Amino acid sequence: MTFYERTVDLGLKAYKTTLSPFIGRQCRYLPTCSEYAAQALKDHGPLKGSWLAVGRICRCNPLGGSGYDPPPPPKTPRKWKCEE
């Protein structure tokens, strides 16, 4: 885990243990935004995972949607075939 991934993971854990119990469940989606962010970081790395998490947080509002919205699956790298 890189320094950035550890920092974001620590921030998510701090949010879940300190603020989340007092605020209550506010997220309109499943998995919650913090769970989505953790999974996106794990699957896509720090740069794309953060971008996906920010997009999800922006969608989580009264005018946005609701329901089941998991992070997209990671893309498998293309395998180039050399024909001889």
Curated annotation (Swiss-Prot):
Membrane topology: Peripheral membrane protein
Keyword Membrane set for record: yes
Positions of the UniProt region annotated as Disordered: 63-84
Subcellular location: Cell inner membrane
A single Gene Ontology CC term: plasma membrane
Family: Belongs to the UPF0161 family.
NCBIfam families to which the protein is assigned, alphabetical: membrane protein insertion efficiency factor YidD
Protein name (record): Putative membrane protein insertion efficiency factor
Organism: Caulobacter sp. (strain K31)
